Design a protein with these regions (language model features):
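Beta-strand elements within well-structured catalytic alpha/beta cores of enzymes
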Residues: 1-5, 24-25, 34, 49-51, ...
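Active-site-proximal N-terminal segment of extracellular/periplasmic enzymes that hydrolyze or transfer
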Residues: 1-30, 97
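Sec/Tat-exported extracytoplasmic proteins
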Residues: 8, 26-29, 34, 39, ...
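Short, solvent-exposed turn/loop segments enriched in Gly/Ser/Thr/Pro and often Arg
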Residues: 11-15, 31-53, 61-67, 104-115, ...
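Polar, surface-exposed loop/tail segments
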Residues: 19-20, 49, 98, 107, ...
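Short, hydrophobic alpha-helical packing/hinge segments within bilobed ligand-binding/sensory domains
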Residues: 22, 45, 91-92
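Formylglycine-dependent
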Residues: 60-100, 110-191
Length: 191
């Protein structure tokens, strides 16, 4: 989950949020009690997970494009890219070389079109764009058209008025896993 803290889960004592499925996984599997997140925000952390590099090495230390290198600031900012550089190998690229089918479904927020998931080793990209969120999570996901196309959800076929984006993306993820299981091909799902 994006920006999920360890204390947000009921298996760690949180009474506010009920997380039965995650609790079951924690009980039956492994708990990461000493894990380290590369950044407190989404974009740098996602880039670090995909490349294995610290956000500072990638020059990706923020998630807000509007916070990048604006000339009227009194403090000098470090160079900060608004895209995941193609020169860095990603987990998906390495898995692709090993014969995996790679699907990215959901939030990307790692740069413009030339740096979308297909450019980083993913066979499928559903929803991954420059923007961190669609204008709305209710179908048709693009609201009133106020924002540019990159704020929409690409490669997701039309749905119905009652469709909620999280449910649609979950359905696509499940369908992708079922398809890959039928062909007995190893796969990596980045959701």
């Amino acid at each position: 989950a994006d920006d999920l803290g360890w204390a947000d889960l009921s298996c760690y004592g949180n009474d506010l949020h009920q997380t039965p499925n995650l609790d079951r996984l924690a009980k039956q599997g492994v708990r990461f009690t000493d894990a380290y997140s590369a950044s407190p925000v989404c974009t740098p952390t996602r880039a670090a997970i995909l490349t294995g590099l610290h956000p500072a090495r990638l020059h990706m230390t923020t998630w807000r494009e509007s916070a990048l290198n604006r000339g009227n600031r009194k403090l000098l900012q470090p160079v900060c890219l608004d895209y995941l550089p193609l020169k860095h190998a990603t987990l998906a690229e390495l898995l692709k070389q090993a014969g995996y089918f790679n699907a990215h479904i959901g939030k990307w927020h790692l740069g413009r079109a030339e740096s979308y998931p297909h450019a980083h080793g993913f066979h499928v990209n559903i929803g991954g764009t420059l923007w961190g969120a669609p204008q709305t999570f209710w179908y048709p996901y693009n609201g009133d058209g106020y924002f540019r196309d990159w704020r929409y959800v690409p490669d997701l076929e039309p749905g119905s008025e009652d469709d909620y984006l999280t449910d649609r993306l979950t359905d696509k993820a499940l369908a992708t896993m079922e398809e890959q299981a039928k062909v007995s091909r190893p796969f990596y799902l980045n959701l």
